């Protein structure tokens, strides 16, 4: 088998519809658009969500909620993920280097999920009460 001999299975691909190519094709003259009307014209169709002048659904339903723009740059990291960091001092940059958080993250919080097996020193990183206790119990410290 060679890449240049690969072909789809017989009957798995259908030929594209050739519109407006004579009455024998079955899609001649009006090309499957019927007679007249807005939808038969070139470029003619209503915009998405238009309901013929009736108040559209997305305007009938109430607005709600709010998404903080700064929330995009905040991340949570679990306690057991700190085991993957091969460094004694854990900062925002070391977490980025080891691929635990995205490059655009500005604030991180360590949460108590899982167990930590080694002593690490957190610098400039927030953590929950439970996570702080677990880190200090493992011989690490939070600064």
From Swiss-Prot:
GO biological-process terms attached to the record: translation
Membrane-spanning parts: none
GO MF annotation, one: rRNA binding
SUPFAM superfamilies with a match to the protein in the record: Ribosomal proteins L15p and L18e (SSF52080)
Domain of life where this protein originates: Bacteria
Cellular component terms per the entry's GO annotation: cytosolic large ribosomal subunit
Biased composition (Gly residues): 21-31
Region annotation Disordered: where it falls in the sequence: 1-52
Keyword Signal: no
InterPro entries: Ribosomal_uL15, Ribosomal_uL15/eL18, Ribosomal_uL15/eL18_sf, Ribosomal_uL15_bac-type, Ribosomal_uL15_CS
Stated family: Belongs to the universal ribosomal protein uL15 family.
Function statement: Binds to the 23S rRNA.
HAMAP family documented for this protein: Ribosomal_uL15 (MF_01341)
Name of the molecule in the record: Large ribosomal subunit protein uL15
Organism this protein belongs to: Francisella tularensis subsp. novicida (strain U112)
